[in-house]
Structure formats: structure tokens, C-alpha cells
Curated annotation (Swiss-Prot):
<protein>
    <recommendedName>
        <fullName>U11-theraphotoxin-Hhn1p</fullName>
    </recommendedName>
</protein>
<dbReference type="GO" id="GO:0005576">
    <property type="term" value="C:extracellular region"/>
</dbReference>
<keyword id="KW-0964">Secreted</keyword>
<feature type="region of interest" description="Disordered">
    <location>
        <begin position="61"/>
        <end position="83"/>
    </location>
</feature>
<keyword id="KW-0800">Toxin</keyword>
<keyword id="KW-0732">Signal</keyword>
<feature type="disulfide bond">
    <location>
        <begin position="89"/>
        <end position="110"/>
    </location>
</feature>
<comment type="similarity">
    <text>Belongs to the neurotoxin 14 (magi-1) family. 01 (HNTX-16) subfamily.</text>
</comment>
<dbReference type="InterPro" id="IPR012627">
    <property type="entry name" value="Toxin_22"/>
</dbReference>
<dbReference type="GO" id="GO:0090729">
    <property type="term" value="F:toxin activity"/>
</dbReference>
<comment type="function">
    <text>Probable ion channel inhibitor.</text>
</comment>
<feature type="propeptide">
    <location>
        <begin position="22"/>
        <end position="74"/>
    </location>
</feature>
<keyword id="KW-0872">Ion channel impairing toxin</keyword>
<feature type="signal peptide">
    <location>
        <begin position="1"/>
        <end position="21"/>
    </location>
</feature>
<keyword id="KW-1015">Disulfide bond</keyword>
<dbReference type="GO" id="GO:0019871">
    <property type="term" value="F:sodium channel inhibitor activity"/>
</dbReference>
<feature type="disulfide bond">
    <location>
        <begin position="75"/>
        <end position="90"/>
    </location>
</feature>
């Protein structure tokens, strides 16, 4: 009867120790898989970020081209007072001191070139 108990105890100890080894091995495999998954997610995230940056650059390029081709805005028309140091006269106009009329205002006006 003692041999049966000893045999049973020996088998039980071996099963428990081998089971724990399998558990540790499974845990290590799971860690490796999660690390691989994380690296894949990092790669996918970086790829998506690059695509978004390229798209943003294209959109900003289109905006700058559009602003270059758009009409002039916020300019001063003909016969309107302007600042001598910062003339904002429309294209084709120049900020000049008036010849006859308006000299008493001591101001500059936008005139045709």
C-alpha cells in the first residue's frame, strides 16, 4: 500500500511540476505574440501617420496655390487716402501726395500710375 501511495505521490509531483513548466512556456509564448502584435500595430500606426502627413502636405499645397491665384483682397481704391509707409493700393494704383486738391489734408491718396 505504501508503494502505491509513493507512486501516486511521485506521479502527482511530476504532473504538477511539468504542468507549471507548460504554464510558464505558455506565458512566454503569449508575451512573444503580444510583443509581435504591438510591433505590428506600431508599424501600422507609423504607416498611417505617414499617409496622413502626405495628405496634409498635399492639402496645404493646394491651399497655397489657390491663394496665389486668387484675386487681390483688401486693397484701397482710386482716390482713397493711403498710408505713405504702408500703401495698400490696388494693383495699378500708387500712393502719391495729391497735386492740387486735397493738399490741405496732408495725406497721400491712391492714384493711377
Amino acid at each position: 500500500m505504501n508503494t502505491v501511495r509513493v507512486t501516486f505521490l511521485l506521479v502527482f509531483v511530476l504532473a504538477v511540476s511539468l504542468g507549471q513548466a507548460d504554464k510558464d512556456e505558455n506565458r512566454m509564448e503569449m508575451q512573444e505574440k503580444t510583443e509581435q502584435g504591438k510591433s505590428y500595430l506600431d508599424f501600422a500606426e507609423n504607416l498611417l501617420l505617414q499617409k496622413l502627413e502626405e495628405l496634409e502636405a498635399k492639402l496645404l499645397e493646394e491651399d497655397s496655390e489657390e491663394s496665389r491665384n486668387s484675386r487681390q483682397k483688401r486693397c484701397i481704391g482710386e482716390g482713397v487716402p493711403c498710408d505713405e509707409n504702408d500703401p495698400r493700393c490696388c494693383s495699378g494704383l500708387v500712393c502719391l501726395k495729391p497735386a492740387l486738391h486735397g493738399i490741405w489734408y496732408k495725406s497721400y491718396y491712391c492714384y493711377k500710375k
